[in-house]
Amino acid sequence: MRVWESGRESNLLDDIIVGRKTIEGRLNRGKFAEYSVGDIVSLRRDYRDTKGILHDGEPDAAQVKIVAIRHYKTFIDMVESENYKSVIPSANSVKEAATIYDNYYSMGDQNKYGVLAIEIEYITEP
């Protein structure tokens, strides 16, 4: 078991803490490709400034345990197969959830690396 650090915007972190967000979608690259079931992720509470720029925020705001990792080709494939509300609780449809991811990750990168549905379980609020 390894312990990782990663940031989440405040609203998504709140969704994780109350159990609405149980699946984290990421490209299958970098540290996310190294995640394993049983690993712990210490989450930072990141925030956007008035210009919309994302900044690292409060460290150790919450901890989650990785309980499953599923592989998909694209984010649309992921949100069609997973409960999209467990991925993006604020989304009103599968298409809206996929579009949110498409704003961050190009289709080229999705096709190159593939996508991970990282199922998480909230374990503590340090």
Model-derived segments and their meaning:
Residues 2, 6-126:
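Structured alpha/beta reader/binder surfaces that contact nucleic acids or chromatin modification marks
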